[in-house]
């Protein structure tokens, strides 16, 4: 789970995140999605938006797995440059430059039916404004 990286390297704005391929002997951790390996191939550095797109894709591919400590339920305010929110009616707000990542669940279960991501740019997406996963302005609820 990419979001587990933020548990260990939580200073998002001053950290770098990479897409890697674990190789050799692999060992999974029973606590979260950590693994250890004897070889690690670094494929490329991820831009901030790419990191959260990978996190959203992981949630969609593994809807029953824990989301990680940085994912909020239903509503979130960005902190440290981002907000990741999951729920039936996810909504979030942030400051200029913040990334908002949304995972909307199906009404009848945890399956993810819609993923979306935006950057608060001050033009199309405004600071301190609540948005739903379709980037429509909404109430905090």
Cite the ranges covered by each PLM segment.
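Short, glycine-biased loop/turn motifs at secondary-structure junctions and
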Residues: 2-141
């Amino acid at each position: 789970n990419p979001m587990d990286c933020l548990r260990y390297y939580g200073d998002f704005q001053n950290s770098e995140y990479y897409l890697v391929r674990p190789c050799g002997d692999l060992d999974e951790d029973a606590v979260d999605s950590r693994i250890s390996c004897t070889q690690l191939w670094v494929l490329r550095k991820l831009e901030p938006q790419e990191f959260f797109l990978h996190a959203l894709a992981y949630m969609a591919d593994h809807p029953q797995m824990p989301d990680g400590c940085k994912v909020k339920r239903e509503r979130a305010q960005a902190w440290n440059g981002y907000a990741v929110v999951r729920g039936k009616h996810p909504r979030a707000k942030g400051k200029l430059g913040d990334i908002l990542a949304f995972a909307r669940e199906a009404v009848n279960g945890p399956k993810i039916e819609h993923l979306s991501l935006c950057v608060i740019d001050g033009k199309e997406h405004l600071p301190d404004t609540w948005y739903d996963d379709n980037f429509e302005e909404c109430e905090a609820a």
